[in-house]
Amino acid sequence: MNRIDKTLEKLKANRKKMLSPYITAGDPYPELTVSLMHQLVKSGADVLELGIPFSDPMAEGPVIQRAMERALAHSIHCDDVLNMVRQFRKTDNETPVILMGYLNPIEQYGYDLFAQQAVEAGVDGTILVDLPPEEADGVSRVWQKHGLYSIYLCSPTTSAERMNFINQHANGYLYYVSLKGVTGSDALKLPELKAQYLQRKAQSKLPLMVGFGIKTPEMAAQVAEFADGVIVGATLINEIIEAYEAKKDPLQASGALLSSMRQAIDNIGSMV
C-alpha cells in the first residue's frame, strides 16, 4: 500500500486531520532541506510536499517564487531533489513525500525515467500544477506503471466535467485551492470557503485538503473544522527565510510554527 493511503487510513482511524507543509527543495540552501523535512515530521507533519524549483512558477506568489529563485541559484534540479528524498528515506520510511512542481523539468527528464527514479528514491506522488486532468492520460499511465500517485488541484471554479476527469486519474487526495490567484494570497473568507469546499467534497471520491492562504494556527484550525486537512506553504517559507536571514535557527522557527498548527488543528479536530 502507498504511504499516502496508509497515512490517510491512520488519520481517519484516529479521527485526525491531515497537516501537510510545503517547502522548496534547496531553499534557503541545499544542505538544510533534509533536516527541515525531519524537523517538520517531528513537529506534526503527516505528509511532506517538496517543491521542485522552476524558473517560471506561474501559480506561486512572491514568497514561493523567491524560494525557487534561491534554490535555482544553488543549481537545484530534479536529480538533486530526488537525492534529498533518498537521504530523508535513510531514517524515515513512513512519512509520505509528494513532489510538487511544473511539467517542464519532468518532461525534460523523461516521464518514464523520472517516475522510475522517483519511486526508487522514495517519492509517493506528484502534484503537477500545470498539467490539466484532461491532458493527463499519458503521464497518468506512466505513473500507474511505477506506482506513483497523481494528486490533482481543484478549486471553487472547477466544473463537474473536470471533476469527473480528476476522479478518473487522481490517487491519494485532492489539493483544494481555496483562493483565486497565487499561493500566499490574502483574504480567506471562511463561510464562503466552507460552502464552496463542501460542493467539491460532494463531487470527490478522495479526501480534500485545503491549501492557499492558510497563514496562522487559528486559521488552520478553523479550516480543519470542516476540511479533511490543511496544506501550509508560503507562511512556513516566510518563517524559514526570516530566521535564516536573521541568523537564527530555521529548524526551530519552522518547527515552532508547525507544532502550533498541529496543536490547534488537533484541538478542534478531536471535537468533530
From Swiss-Prot:
Assigned keywords, A-Z: Amino-acid biosynthesis, Aromatic amino acid biosynthesis, Lyase, Tryptophan biosynthesis
Domain of life: Bacteria
Gene Ontology terms: cellular component: cytosol
GO terms of molecular function: tryptophan synthase activity
Enzyme Commission no: 4.2.1.20
Pathway: Amino-acid biosynthesis; L-tryptophan biosynthesis; L-tryptophan from chorismate: step 5/5
Catalysis: reaction(s): (1S,2R)-1-C-(indol-3-yl)glycerol 3-phosphate + L-serine = D-glyceraldehyde 3-phosphate + L-tryptophan + H2O
Pfam families on file: Trp_syntA (PF00290)
Enzyme type, top EC level: lyase
Catalytic residue list: E49 (proton acceptor), E60 (proton acceptor)
Function: The alpha subunit is responsible for the aldol cleavage of indoleglycerol phosphate to indole and glyceraldehyde 3-phosphate.
Family membership noted in the UniProt record: Belongs to the TrpA family.
Subunit note: Tetramer of two alpha and two beta chains.
NCBIfam families: trpA
HAMAP family given in the database record: Trp_synth_alpha
Full protein name: Tryptophan synthase alpha chain
Organism: Legionella pneumophila (strain Corby)
